[in-house]
Amino acid sequence: MALQAASLVSSAFSVRKDAKLNASSSSFKDSSLFGASITDQIKSEHGSSSLRFKREQSLRNLAIRAQTAATSSPTVTKSVDGKKTLRKGNVVVTGASSGLGLATAKALAETGKWNVIMACRDFLKAERAAKSVGMPKDSYTVMHLDLASLDSVRQFVDNFRRTETPLDVLVCNAAVYFPTAKEPTYSAEGFELSVATNHLGHFLLARLLLDDLKKSDYPSKRLIIVGSITGNTNTLAGNVPPKANLGDLRGLAGGLNGLNSSAMIDGGDFDGAKAYKDSKVCNMLTMQEFHRRFHEETGVTFASLYPGCIASTGLFREHIPLFRALFPPFQKYITKGYVSETESGKRLAQVVSDPSLTKSGVYWSWNNASASFENQLSEEASDVEKARKVWEISEKLVGLA
């Protein structure tokens, strides 16, 4: 996301990343529509109970066949001229109501090859955002998802499955950032909010939807977790204090509740900027652990990326006015690292669909206008043993173990 090089201006400037967790809108067929019509017709039936039963059964079977035809389609279909064509892919993008998530949703929708499920916390905001950028109505669906609530994550998965729509790609993009906070804020389950939203919510979502990805007949199934340069301490931006450091994970193991454990993963004093950076390290460790555990078995491509510094994103909207005024030109003319939301969205869309980016376990990056390349992660962000521990502790915290 966009936090990336913000720290280059000054460690005194802190960056706010708002949870872009929203939900999605139209492209699924609602079986309740069929159910309503069945009820109306059955009520109007006259005659013997046997006749009513037969007619009701016939209508039910018709509705089931109609729903199946509407929500499931083979990977390859035949066009009017008889040529084989690939069906549209279905991609879930979290935090798709603004910033990188919205730009990605738009880039994918405009290809005409994807149905985008915009998984967002604010349903109306997501609907307005999709319309404002001109996304075709039949290219997206808004569904509610609040990653700060594990119950909401489970409800989203349940609602998605009720649509009987295949899942081909999951993009874990949404995040929150509280750089100026003096005290921690907590999620519904009592976890520090940055880690709860950015890591634990996505961890549960990805674990649950992995079963859906496995079932997909799409040629290239992918699970993508957006990383950040600020959590990668082998970069200049990653070395600006406070640096990411998970320590021995004592805070994570204690539940990040600020009561019988620290609200910070490493067990230290609360720091909003560091909490965000630590959560992004967890994201990158999680991607690699998914790769090690499931790539060979499932064929799913697991990847992370840093799309560049989106200096003009709404991520910084709650920062001090001076920072908001100076940061974009600083990135454009001094560091040359500035990337527009549109360009960053195209980059993430590339990781979603480009046939040349199917390598699993990779952290993708770009240099200015250069093509994508495999970037190196820091020692901590690529620590195999720490990734295993983060995975196992996270399983317990979200109720999977």
UniProtKB/Swiss-Prot annotation:
Location, primary (coarse class): plastid
Subcellular location: Plastid, Chloroplast outer membrane; Plastid, Chloroplast thylakoid membrane
Pathway linked to the protein: Porphyrin-containing compound metabolism; chlorophyll biosynthesis
Source species, domain of life: Eukaryota
Free-text disruption phenotype from the record: No visible phenotype at the levels of the whole plant or chloroplast ultrastructure; due to the redundancy with PORC. Porb and porc double mutants have a seedling-lethal pale-yellow xantha phenotype at the cotyledon stage, contain only small amounts of Chla, and possess chloroplasts with mostly unstacked thylakoid membranes.
Tissues expressed in: Expressed in flowers, upper leaves, rosette and cauline leaves, stem. Not detectable in non-photosynthetic tissues such as roots and seeds. Expressed in seedlings and adult plant.
Gene Ontology terms, MF aspect: mRNA binding; protein domain specific binding; protochlorophyllide reductase activity
EC identifiers of the protein: 1.3.1.33
GO biological process, one term: photosynthesis
Record function comment: Phototransformation of protochlorophyllide (Pchlide) to chlorophyllide (Chlide).
Note: The presence of TOC33 is required for the import of PORA into plastids in cotyledons and true leaves.
Similarity annotation: Belongs to the short-chain dehydrogenases/reductases (SDR) family. POR subfamily.
Oligomeric form and interacting partners: Part of the FLU-containing chloroplast membrane complex composed of FLU, CRD1, PORB, PORC, CHLP and HEMA1. Interacts with CDF1 in chloroplast.
Name recorded for this polypeptide: Protochlorophyllide reductase B, chloroplastic
Organism per entry: Arabidopsis thaliana
Gene: PORB
